[in-house]
Swiss-Prot record:
Annotated family: Belongs to the peptidase C1 family.
Propeptide: 21-131
Residue ranges annotated as motif Prevents secretion from ER: 359-362
Native source species: Phaseolus vulgaris
Protein name, entry field: Vignain
Length: 362
C-alpha cells in the first residue's frame, strides 16, 4: 500500500510539472530565421525526426507556422497551454489524416446503432464522488502509442476492458490492441478505423482477449495469429451504451468504471495540447476513440473529464488530456457525450484455457 501511495505521489508531482521534461522554446528563439532554424533542428533531435534535405525546408515552413500558433495561443488567457510536440512539422491536414479520422472511411462506424434493449446499469445511481481517478485506483495501464495506424478504437476498447477487469479481479493486465487490429474484421477495419462497441462484441463472442505481451502491438495490420489469440486472458460478458448526449449519465458510468468515448480530436489546439483544462475549438464530427478514466473539478470550479489518449506519454499531460465537463451543449465538448460505451463483467472469473472456434476444429 505504501509503495502504491509513493508511486502516485511521484506521478502527481510529474503531472504538476507538466511540460518540464518536454521540448520548450523562448522568445529569443523566434528572433531570426537562423534562430528558428536552430530551434527546428533541436526539435528534430529531441523527437528523433529524420528528414531529407529537400523535405527539411518544406517541413521547416510548416514548423514555423505551427510554432506561431502555439506561441500566440499560449499568450491568450486560456485555461490550457500548447506545446511543440512530435506533430510540430505536420500540417493540420496531415495530422487529421493520420491521427484523427480520415481513415474512418464510413462515418457509421463511429456513429453505430442504438442498443436494442437500451439497458444502462447505472441509471438508478443517485450520488457519485466529487472526483474519481481510476489511475489512482490501479485500474489503468501505462500510456500507449498507436503510431501511424488508425487503431484508436482498439486502444479505447482495451482501456475500458483492462479497467473493468482490474475492478472485478484486483489484477491489472495489459491487453492486446494488435489482436483487435488483426482479427476483429467483421465490422472493424484495423488501421482504417473501427467502433468500440463492435470490438466489445468481438471480445465477448470470442470468449476473451489475450495479453499485450503475448500479442504485442506493431502499428500495422497483419494476419490474425490463431496461435496467440487462442491464449485468452480476460473475458467480458457484453457491453452497454451510456444514454447519448447526457453528461450526467456519463458521470454515473465513469464513477464506476473507465468508459470508451469518441470525440473530435482534429483541431490544431488538440493537436498541440500540453496541459490544463481543454476548452478549445472542436466540433461534434467524431473522428477519434479515447477513454475517460476519471473526472474532477479545478480549484476555480471548472469541471473536467480525465481522458486517456493513445499518442504516447509525451503528448498532453503525460498522455492524458483534461477536457471541460458539463458544458451547455448536450453533446459535450468535442462530442464526448455522444457515443459512450463500456464493457460488462459480472464476476472475477477469467478464461482458464485456450479458446477453440469451429474453424479451428475443421
Amino acid at each position: 500500500m505504501a509503495t502504491k501511495k509513493l508511486l502516485w505521489v511521484v506521478l502527481s508531482f510529474s503531472l504538476v510539472l507538466g511540460v518540464a521534461n518536454s521540448f520548450d522554446f523562448h522568445d529569443k528563439d523566434l528572433a531570426s530565421e537562423e534562430s528558428l532554424w536552430d530551434l527546428y533542428e533541436r526539435w528534430r533531435s529531441h523527437h528523433t525526426v529524420s528528414r531529407s534535405l529537400g523535405e527539411k525546408h518544406k517541413r521547416f515552413n510548416v514548423f514555423k507556422a505551427n510554432l506561431m500558433h502555439v506561441h500566440n495561443t499560449n499568450k491568450m488567457d486560456k485555461p490550457y497551454k500548447l506545446k511543440l510536440n512530435k506533430f510540430a512539422d505536420m500540417t493540420n491536414h496531415e495530422f487529421r489524416s493520420t491521427y484523427a479520422g480520415s481513415k474512418v472511411n464510413h462515418p457509421r462506424m463511429f456513429r453505430g446503432t442504438p442498443h436494442e434493449n437500451g439497458a444502462f446499469m447505472y441509471e438508478k445511481v443517485v450520488s457519485v464522488p466529487p472526483s474519481v481517478d481510476w489511475r489512482k485506483k490501479g485500474a489503468v495501464t501505462d500510456v500507449k502509442d498507436q503510431g501511424q495506424c488508425g487503431s484508436c478504437w482498439a486502444f479505447s476498447t482495451v482501456v475500458a476492458v483492462e479497467g473493468i477487469n482490474q475492478i472485478k479481479t484486483n489484477k491489472l493486465v495489459a491487453l492486446s490492441e494488435q489482436e483487435l487490429v488483426d482479427c476483429d474484421k467483421e465490422e472493424n477495419q484495423g488501421c482504417n478505423g473501427g467502433l468500440m462497441e463492435s470490438a466489445f462484441e468481438f471480445i465477448k463472442q470470442k470468449g476473451g482477449i489475450t495479453t499485450e505481451s503475448n500479442y504485442p502491438y506493431k502499428a500495422q495490420e497483419g494476419t490474425c495469429d490463431a496461435s496467440k489469440v487462442n491464449d485468452l486472458a480476460v473475458s467480458i460478458d457484453g457491453h452497454e451504451n451510456v444514454p447519448a448526449n447526457d453528461e450526467d449519465a456519463l458521470l454515473k458510468a465513469v464513477a464506476n468504471q473507465p468508459v470508451s468515448v469518441a470525440i473530435d480530436a482534429g483541431g490544431s489546439d488538440f493537436q498541440f495540447y500540453s496541459e490544463g483544462v481543454f476548452t478549445g475549438d472542436c466540433s461534434t464530427d467524431l473522428n477519434h476513440g479515447v477513454a475517460i478514466v476519471g473526472y474532477g473539478t479545478t480549484v476555480d470550479g471548472t469541471n473536467y473529464w480525465i481522458v486517456r489518449n493513445s499518442w504516447g506519454p509525451e503528448w498532453g499531460e503525460h498522455g492524458y488530456i483534461r477536457m471541460q465537463r458539463n458544458i451547455s451543449k448536450k453533446e459535450g465538448l468535442c462530442g464526448i457525450a455522444m457515443l459512450p460505451s463500456y464493457p460488462i463483467k459480472n464476476s472475477s472469473d477469467n478464461p482458464t484455457g485456450s479458446f477453440s472456434s469451429p474453424k479451428d476444429e475443421l
